[in-house]
């Protein structure tokens, strides 16, 4: 299945982050739909361990937007943010009398998509002009 190319969006993907998916979703649900600057303040003040890798991903997505697409950081909004479960690393903890207990280390994949809101206004104007030209024929 081919992925649709969307203009005005950039993303950052973090794979195999050693954290369970529900713990990361708790933070992701708070930042979805917010502006970039508001997200930075929220993540700096939240008391969860998931905030650090998510903050790195948000900064990485903003750097992608600035460097690759020349977007302004003030107009960026987190349009999509999703957390998927990754592989589970299985280990054995040695115990007394030659026994062992299994230990599961869950991982997750986090994807942050930033959208430029100024591009939306341009896109609406552009497609409205294009539609009018089509109707005239």
From Swiss-Prot:
The keyword Iron-sulfur does not apply. GO terms for molecular function: rRNA binding; structural constituent of ribosome. It holds the Pfam family Ribosomal_L22. Keywords: Chloroplast, Plastid, Ribonucleoprotein, Ribosomal protein, RNA-binding, rRNA-binding. The keyword Plastid applies. It is found in: Plastid, Chloroplast. One of its GO terms (biological process) is translation. CDD domains: Ribosomal_L22. It comes from the Eukaryota. NCBIfam families: rplV_bact (TIGR01044). Belongs to the universal ribosomal protein uL22 family. This is Large ribosomal subunit protein uL22c. It comes from Oenothera argillicola. The lineage of its organism: Eukaryota, Viridiplantae, Streptophyta, Embryophyta, Tracheophyta.
């Amino acid at each position: 299945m081919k992925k649709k190319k969307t203009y005005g969006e950039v993303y950052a993907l973090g794979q195999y982050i050693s954290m369970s998916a529900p713990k990361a979703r708790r933070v992701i649900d708070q930042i979805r739909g917010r502006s970039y600057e508001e997200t930075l303040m929220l993540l700096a003040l939240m008391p969860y361990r998931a905030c650090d890798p998510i903050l790195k991903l948000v900064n990485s997505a903003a750097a992608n937007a600035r460097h690759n697409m020349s977007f302004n950081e003030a107009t960026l909004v987190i349009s999509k943010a999703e957390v998927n479960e990754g592989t589970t690393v299985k280990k054995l903890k040695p115990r007394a009398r030659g026994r062992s207990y299994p230990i599961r280390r869950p991982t997750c994949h986090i994807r942050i998509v930033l959208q430029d809101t100024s591009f939306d206004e341009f896109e609406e104007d552009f497609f409205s002009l294009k539609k009018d030209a089509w109707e005239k024929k």
